[in-house]
Amino acid sequence: FFENFGFEKYSKLKDDTGEFIFRKRMKPRTSDYTILSPLEFDIKFGPRYFNDEQDAFLVPVISSYHNMLFPESIKENLLFPQLDYMDSFSNAMRKAYLCKSNSTLVREGAILFFYKSHDMGTIETCGMVERVERLQNPDEIISVTGKRTVYQREEIKTMCSGGKNILVLLFRQAESFSK
C-alpha cells in the first residue's frame, strides 16, 4: 500500500513486532526528471510534482458529481460542513472518471484539471492519470474502477447501453485549489 504513494521500506523495527519503518524522499535528484515517467515521478515525489513536458486536459464534471467526487470543494463554502458526507470514492486520493468522450489523447501521466461544467466553470481540482481504458461492458468497468467512481452500478449500465465505448480514467487526485 505505502509503495503506491512513493514510500520505501527502510528497515524493520528491532523489537520484532513485524512492523516496518517506511521513508519517502521529498526532493527529486536531477536524474529523476529524465529517468522516471510522469506517473512514476508523481508516485515517488507527489502529489503536486508536475513538469512542463506533461500533457494537460480540462475535464468537465457535472456539479452534483463534482461535489460527490471532490467534497472538499463544497465543504470549503460551508460554515458547518457535514462530516457524515463521506463515501469511499470521495475519501480517497485514487479516483475514477467515466465519460463517453471519443478522445484518444489522454495517456498515463497526463494532468487533469477538473471544473464544474454547468456551474461556476472554475477549476477546483487537479490530478494525474494512472490508467486509461476504453470499455463497453459494465461489469468490466465496475471491476476496473472498484469504489473509485461516483457512479452506481445501474448508472454505469445505462451509460453502456448505447453501445459506445466508455472512457475510464483512473487518476490520483493531486490538489484541491483553495478559494
Residue map of PLM features:
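Short coil-to-beta transition motif at edge beta-strands of beta-rich domains
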Residues: 101-116
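Short His-Asn-centered micro-motif
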Residues: 60, 115-116, 126
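Contiguous surface segments at macromolecular interaction interfaces
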Residues: 1-77, 87, 134-179
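Short beta-strand-centered aromatic/proline hotspots
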Residues: 122-133
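Short, structured beta-strand/loop micro-motifs enriched in basic residues and often containing a Trp
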Residues: 87-98
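Conserved active-site/ligand-binding neighborhood in enzyme cores
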Residues: 72, 96-104
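Short gly/pro-enriched beta-turn/loop segments at secondary-structure junctions
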Residues: 52, 107-109, 122
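Short, flexible beta-strand-to-coil junctions
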Residues: 116-120, 175
